[in-house]
Amino acid sequence: MTAQSSSTQARHGMTTDNEVLLEVKGLCVDYVTESGNIRACDNVNFLLRRGEILGVAGESACGKSTLLNALGRLQRMPAATSAGQILFHDRNGSVTDLATLSEADLKPYRWTKIAVVMQSAMACLNPILKLSEQFIDVQRAHDPSLAEKDALTK
C-alpha cells in the first residue's frame, strides 16, 4: 500500500499552507479472530497538511479500506485499532487524538471537519447532474440551513 499526497495549491501556483491538518503516528489495526489477531495496518505514519490531497493505492486486500475506515473511526468488528494516534490539528490551534474520542465526542468532527471519500460504484458522481448540484446536495445533507452560494464556496 502506498500513500501519497500532493498540494493542489502548489500545482496551481498558489502559496502552500504548511499547517498540519492530520498526523497519523504508529497506527495499527488488527482483525480479531478466534485463531489470533491479523495485523492489517502496521505502524502507519504520515502527515497531511492543509490544501493537500492524499491518495492511498495498493493491491487488493492490502489494507487501504482498513486504514481509511480507521482514520474516520468507521471500522466494525472484527477490525479494531490496537495502537497509534490520529491527531487532528484544528485551525484554532488545538490538537485532538481522534483515536481516543468517544462516539459522542467524535460527532462534531465527523463529516464536518474530517471525512473519508471511498471509491465505490454506488458513491460515484452522477453523470446526469451538474457537479455543483451534487456538491450542494452533500453540503445541505450535513447542514440544511446552508445557502447555495455558501455550499459552493465551502
Task: Annotate each language-model stretch with its function.
Residues 2-154:
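ABC transporter nucleotide-binding domains
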